[in-house]
Amino acid sequence: MQKLIAIHNGVARLPEWRLASPVSFELLEGENIAIVGPNGGGKTMFVDMLTGSHPLLGDNPTYDFGPGSKPLVSDNIKYIQFTDSYGENDSTYYLQQRWNQQEIDESTPTARQILDSAMQLARADAQRARSWQAHLYAMFDIEHTLDKHIILLSSGELRKIQIIKALLSMPRLLIIDNPFIGLDATARGQLDGLLGELCHDGALQLILVLAKYNEIPPYITHVVNVADMEVKAKVERSVFASSCNPSGVSLPREVEQALLQHPYRASEHSADEVVRMKNVSIRYGSRTILDGLDWMVRNGEHWAVTGKNGSGKSTLLSLVCADNPQSYACDISLFGNRRGSGESIWDIKRHIGYVSPEMHRAYKKNLPTINIVASGMKESVGQYSNPTEAELDNCRWWMWVFGLQGCEDRPFLKLSSGQQRLALLVRAFVKDPELLVLDEPLHGLDDGNRQRVKDIIETFCRRKNKTLIMVTHYMEELPPCIDHTLTLERKV
C-alpha cells in the first residue's frame, strides 16, 4: 500500500527538537490521523518531523504523494498551526494595532489578496478552482471580510481565512492544529462536515492535532497518542476510544485554599460601576460593529459575552481594556471615570488582567517565561524593566497555581502553544486584578489544564470584589460563577 509519509527511527539533528526516543511512523493511503496528548507532550515536535521542518540524523522522511503530485513537499502538505489563527508573521505588529486603523500600512494584504494568491496553487483547472472558491466563501460566510486588512480580522474570522487558504490549494495532505478553536458553533459544524466529505471522497488526507479527546471526529481512522515526549504506536480509532478515559483533574485543595487566602493587592475596589456604556456605536468604514449598546457591569459581577464570529466581541473588549481610540467619542466610563476625563490608559489597565488570541500573536520575543509573566505587573508586551525579587516570587507563586512550575527559565517561544497560553493566563492574574477580561482563555488547552484553569477562574471570583468578563464559543467552558450574559449579534 502507498506510504504517503514514512519515518524509520527518526531523531532530530538538533537536540532542542528531539523527542525522548526515535520515531517510526507510516501514513498509508486512505488513513486520516488524530494526534492527541497533553500540552507540552511533544505533539508539535512530531508534526514538525512529519513535515520535514527539522532535519534528522540519518535518513529524512520519505514521501510518496502519488502520480501527478507537485514536486515540493510543501506544496503537497499544508499545515495550519495554532498560532496561525493570530495572524501573519509580521514583526512590526503590536497588540493595539487592530484598533488603530490609521497606522496600518496599505501594503498590508487584505483577506481577498491572501486567498487569491492561494488559488495559484490549486490542483484543479481554473473553472473548478473558481467554483471551489465560491463554495468555500459561501459556506464560511466570509464575503463581508474579504476586503479587510488581514490584521483587522477577529481571531475567528482569521481562522476561517487560514482554513480556506489551505483548502483552496487542494493539498494531498492537510494538517490542522486544533481545527475548531476560535470558531463559533455554526462554523465548527460546517468545517467538520466539509472535512468529512473531503476525506470520504478521497480528495485529501487529514491529520488533526487535538487537545480535546472528545473532538476526534468519526472520519478519523487512526489515533497517535504523544505524551511525555514519546510518540506511541498508531492505533485504530475504535481501539483508542475503548481505552481512553479523558477527564479533567480538579484544582488541588492545597492550591484552592492558597488562592482563597491570597493577600489582596489593594485594600479597596476602585468603583461600584466597573464598566458603563451608554448608546455606544462603533463603525469602521461602512460597517457597523456595535450599534447603540447600553451595558453596565458592576463590581463583583461575572459576565459571559457570546456571539458568532464577527459579532463585535473583541471590539467590545477593546473598549473595556482602553485599547480602542474610538472610545473617546463614546459615552464610556471605566472604574467610575468617564473616558477622556484625564485618566491615562495605564490608570485603567492597572485594574485589569487580560488575555486574548491577539495577545498571543504579540508575544514574539524569546524571553524567559517568568519575564513574560512579570510583564503583566507593568502592562508591557515583553519586559522593559527588571522585576524585583518580591515580584519574581509573586510570579513563581502564580506559576505554581497554574501548574507551570519548572517553566520559569524556559524561553517562551520554546514552550508548546498550550503552555504559552497558560503562561499568558498567569500574566493576566499576576497582579491580582479587580477585573479579569478573558477572551477565549481555554484555547488549545488539554482536558486537564482546561479543568484546572476553569477551577482557578471560579475560585478567584469567589474572592471579594472580583469582576469577570469572559468570551467563549463553548458554553461548557464557562465557570459556575457566571451570573450575567451579554449576547452580541453581527450587524449586516
Language model features: what each stretch is:
Residues 128-145, 389-407:
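Conserved ABC ATPase "signature" region
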Residues 149, 178-180, 411, 440-441:
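Walker B catalytic motif
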Residues 162-163, 425:
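Hydrophobic anchor residue at the start of the ABC signature
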Residues 228-258, 479-480, 488-492:
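Conserved beta-strand-loop-alpha-helix hinge in the C-terminal portion
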